Amino acid sequence: MQHYGVNGYSLHAMNSLSAMYNLHQQAAQQAQHAPDYRPSVHALTLAERLAGCTFQDIILEARYGSQHRKQRRSRTAFTAQQLEALEKTFQKTHYPDVVMRERLAMCTNLPEARVQVWFKNRRAKFRKKQRSLQKEQLQKQKEAEGSHGEGKAEAPTPDTQLDTEQPPRLPGSDPPAELHLSLSEQSASESAPEDQPDREEDPRAGAEDPKAEKSPGADSKGLGCKRGSPKADSPGSLTITPVAPGGGLLGPSHSYSSSPLSLFRLQEQFRQHMAATNNLVHYSSFEVGGPAPAAAAAAAAVPYLGVNMAPLGSLHCQSYYQSLSAAAAAHQGVWGSPLLPAPPAGLAPASATLNSKTTSIENLRLRAKQHAASLGLDTLPN
């Protein structure tokens, strides 16, 4: 005897098709009174189950069993208690085993297949929720990065404004050097008018060198150029600067007086002084020695060699200047002969003739080279 299980019920209780037909008629009459009543599938009785089927389906089911057609199962409606039990179990584990599913089915009065399918759907729902959360987090991170990027893009704008404001300040760093040069030029231009009274008192100076008739502005420019480039002090340029004993020494000493005394500047002053004395040395060999005021004039001219320079023996570089003074004494007795003041007006023609013979450019260049070679200044740094 075959038993065909339909939702927990067997068909062996039905003995004939007539009995089944009678049940069907009764169920149809009951369904007409309450057509909107659709209880849960598990709560349906056999009469209610048969009420939804046609007579042909009942005959086919009785003859061939329930496997002759594809069964259409209605959607299971879970109660609140069933859902609560299922959710608690899902919080414990997402993959319950068979034993856990059987117990849960007994507790919730649900078939084990429904429990298994519910867990499968619940896992799919959980994965979908996780993906949506990840997408939201990524979107928030992108928005945060975009806001940070905009903040960084906005932050450099004040920096660029500062950079645009800074270039005008860069030329402002040059004024100290420009001020220094302008001060040196101003001091040279101030020293140039001081030279002019000496030139006016010395009528022989105008007859000595025709190049001495340059304007004070030209002298100041020459001094500025000489201070800017030390290499410009060639023997040819040395012949232009010294004109008078006081005049040739005032310009460089005045411009150097604002800065500390250094070895390089002392060398420059020494070269200028020696170039100035080259034009004056030959006077001591041809003319009578200066009177008593000559020593006073030499003493008055000495402070212009530097910042109130002491005698060579009392300087810090004593050995260096002793060697220089020895070489200078060996060469024409430069330091021994005093700097001569302006001679009387009667000796001007004779001195002019001597000057025209001895102060030519070639002789002066030769004298400067010989003097530099004797002092060993060619090996010194320029």
From Swiss-Prot:
Placement of sequence motif OAR: 359-372
DNA-binding region per Swiss-Prot/TrEMBL record: 71-130
Any one Gene Ontology molecular-function term assigned to this protein's record: sequence-specific DNA binding
Residue ranges crossing the lipid bilayer per the database entry: none
Pfam families: Homeodomain (PF00046), OAR (PF03826)
SUPFAM superfamilies: Homeodomain-like
Principal location: nucleus
Origin superkingdom: Eukaryota
Location in or out of the cell: Nucleus
GO biological process, one term: developmental growth
Keyword field: Developmental protein, DNA-binding, Homeobox, Nucleus, Repressor, Transcription, Transcription regulation
Compositionally biased intervals (Low complexity): 178-191
CDD domains cross-referenced by the UniProt entry: homeodomain
Biased composition annotated in UniProt, kind: Basic and acidic residues: 133-153, 201-216
One GO CC annotation: nucleus
Gene3D superfamilies: Homeodomain-like
InterPro entries assigned: DMBX_homeobox, HD, Homeobox_CS, Homeodomain-like_sf, OAR_dom
UniProt region (Interaction with OTX2 and is required for repressor activity), positions on chain: 1-156
Region (Disordered) residue spans: 128-252
Family classification: Belongs to the paired homeobox family.
Subunit structure, interactors included: Homodimer or heterodimer. Forms heterodimers with OTX2.
Function, as annotated: Functions as a transcriptional repressor. May repress OTX2-mediated transactivation by forming a heterodimer with OTX2 on the P3C (5'-TAATCCGATTA-3') sequence. Required for brain development.
Protein name: Diencephalon/mesencephalon homeobox protein 1
Organism, scientific name: Homo sapiens
